[in-house]
């Protein structure tokens, strides 16, 4: 089977369930942005993969990557086809919240805004965070056209918090001072 079908050559694509839409459709923009995020998360995971002491973060990120595939599929469901994709479980959101809570407990509280950076892997966390926030905005645009699952909206909202805190935690792991924003 060839990877190309030529069915998208005129700017259309097919959602799960058979609905044909323009590639600029809000749902396509939403799952495309989550797909973009997954590439950045994979890069972040690869940066940490052989770092001593980072195995737990790699495991979390691999789990998040798997969850992202589910989210992409859910966002790609058309008017028909919801029976073809497993929903995102509430447990998935609860697991992510627990990971966020753990990361937050491992870093000192902040009373000021910080500037991203200080280490390439920390910067990668902030790229993931900002692309995640864009994905969330795209999901809400798609939600106006066709309601999107509440679990997806909650999960993507939490995910940007996860990347922010992972960046903070990695700053401490690498011994990098968090840079304070001074207006």
Please provide the spans of the model-predicted regions:
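Phosphate/pyrophosphate-binding loop motifs in nucleotide- or prenyl diphosphate-using proteins
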Residues: 1-183
């Amino acid at each position: 089977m060839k990877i190309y079908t030529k069915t998208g050559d005129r700017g259309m694509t097919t959602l799960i369930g058979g609905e044909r839409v323009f590639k600029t459709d809000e749902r396509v923009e939403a799952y495309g942005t989550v797909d973009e995020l997954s590439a950045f998360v994979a890069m972040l995971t690869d940066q940490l993969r052989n770092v001593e002491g980072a195995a737990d973060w790699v495991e979390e990120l691999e789990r998040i990557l798997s969850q992202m595939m589910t989210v992409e599929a859910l966002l790609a469901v058309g008017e028909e086809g919801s029976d073809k994709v497993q929903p995102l479980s509430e447990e998935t959101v609860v697991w992510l919240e627990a990971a966020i809570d753990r990361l937050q407990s491992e870093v000192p509280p902040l009373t000021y805004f910080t500037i991203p950076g200080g280490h390439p892997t920390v910067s990668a966390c902030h790229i993931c965070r900002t692309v995640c926030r864009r994905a969330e905005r795209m999901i809400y645009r798609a939600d106006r056209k066709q309601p999107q699952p509440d679990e997806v909206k909650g999960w993507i909202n939490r995910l940007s918090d996860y990347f922010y805190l992972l960046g903070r935690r990695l700053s401490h792991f690498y011994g990098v001072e968090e840079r304070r924003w001074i207006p």
